[in-house]
Amino acid sequence: MKLSSCVLIFLLCNTFSSISAFRLSRSQPTERISGSAGDVLEDDPVGRLKVFVYELPSKYNKKILQKDPRCLNHMFAAEIYMQRFLLSSPVRTLNPEEADWFYVPVYTTCDLTPNGLPLPFKSPRMMRSAIQLIASNWPYWNRTEGADHFFVVPHDFGACFHYQEEKAIGRGILPLLQRATLVQTFGQRNHVCLKEGSITVPPYAPPQKMQSHLIPEKTPRSIFVYFRGLFYDVGNDPEGGYYARGARAAVWENFKDNPLFDISTEHPTTYYEDMQRAIFCLCPLGWAPWSPRLVEAVIFGCIPVIIADDIVLPFADAIPWEDIGVFVDEKDVPYLDTILTSIPPEVILRKQRLLANPSMKQAMLFPQPAQPGDAFHQVLNGLARKLPHERSVYLRPGEKLLNWTAGPVADLKPW
């Protein structure tokens, strides 16, 4: 026992001496972000596209929010704030004939349980109803069957509209949205709920709340690995092998007693402050591969350790996530301590410099009011990069590609 304790002390001293260079302070010089699409985070979309916003009856959006204002602070709130942003954005046009894109403001995630969980079961019928409305009252949907339209679908599995992955896969993306561009938080390669051309965005995290918890920049990062959240979802996965594909359970079982890992199910009032004192923040998958932890880690300069195989991260065509985060395969979770302690200090320092770049943080947020370079502008930049539309977008007279009667029978009922 004494020998193992000595070995542990030696390892701890060795580890923390090797990271002393970046443990002293949270303050780091910034480094310019250069994404795979070029230096685009600071691009201004104004003048590059025009968006027409459909004026739908309030039952599709505003009345739903009036019924439950909690939706404003939910991690799916991007669908609400996107509409508000576009209504006052200089890219908006009131003349649909000059529009490059058409936006359909439908709030599909604002039907919440008493515990604040979204119930997406009515969403397919609501979406079908909205599409039928615009197809009947404007000519623009019918000329492309939605190929120059975009929708914000921020639910767990996007436009598959189910919170359980197996059932979401069985449903697939709503057939009427097959040609539209989907703006969604869900992103996983080779998954039926992420179609080609979708724009993956960060989940909503309240900017003002995070701002109010900032601590002095020179505060030491004295926590090596930090995580707060569920390891087991006993209520929905009693045997523990399905939730997070076992990755969270593996974190707990392997590292609950490791002094380098500050992990717990308890969510302290100092959660945001603790993230600012940490070097690495675990961002494992849950029921879906994404969560607000990624946004929080970036905002607080904590290197995100992404444990979610095949995840597609927000604005991946503009942000060099490989340079900013650490990716760990789900099967390699038992070796997490070795992986993280093996990263050279100079690599960690560079990741911290990239995270310190204000444009990186801004791209993760949906602030009110909007600010240059924020997530709203990154969505518009993503849409602008798709222009001009290919000729194949426009259908020949009388041509029909979508099947209006496809999908589950329950989805065809009037809403």
From Swiss-Prot:
Please give the knockout or disruption phenotype noted for this protein: No visible phenotype. Slightly short inflorescence and reduced fertility.
Is the keyword Cell division assigned to this protein? no
Protein's membrane topology: Single-pass type II membrane protein
Glycan-carrying positions: 142, 403
**Biological processes, Gene Ontology terms:** cell wall biogenesis; cell wall organization; glucuronoxylan biosynthetic process; plant-type secondary cell wall biogenesis; protein glycosylation; xylan biosynthetic process
- State which tissues express it: Present in the xylem and phloem, and, to a lower extent, in interfascicular cells. Expressed in the root tip, shoot apical meristem (SAM), xylem cells of roots and stems, and in the vasculature of roots, cotyledons and leaves.
Q: Which residues cross the membrane?
A: 2-22
EC number(s) in its UniProt entry? Answer: 2.4.2.-
The record's Gene Ontology cellular component field reads: endosome; Golgi apparatus; Golgi medial cisterna; Golgi membrane; trans-Golgi network
Under the heading Pfam families, the entry gives: Exostosin_GT47 (PF03016)
Instruction: Please give the residue ranges for the topological domain Cytoplasmic.
Output: 1
Q: Where in the cell is it found?
A: Golgi apparatus membrane
Give the top-level enzyme category: transferase
The molecular function GO annotations come to: 1,4-beta-D-xylan synthase activity; glucuronoxylan glucuronosyltransferase activity
Its chief place of residence is Golgi
- Annotated keywords: Cell wall biogenesis/degradation, Glycoprotein, Glycosyltransferase, Golgi apparatus, Membrane, Signal-anchor, Transferase, Transmembrane, Transmembrane helix
* Domain of life of the native organism: Eukaryota
Q: Which family does it belong to?
A: Belongs to the glycosyltransferase 47 family.
Describe the function of this protein. Involved in the synthesis of the hemicellulose glucuronoxylan, a major component of secondary cell walls. Probably involved in the elongation of glucuronoxylan xylosyl backbone.
The protein's name: Probable beta-1,4-xylosyltransferase IRX10L
Q: What organism, scientifically named, is this protein from? A: Arabidopsis thaliana
Source taxonomy: Eukaryota, Viridiplantae, Streptophyta, Embryophyta, Tracheophyta
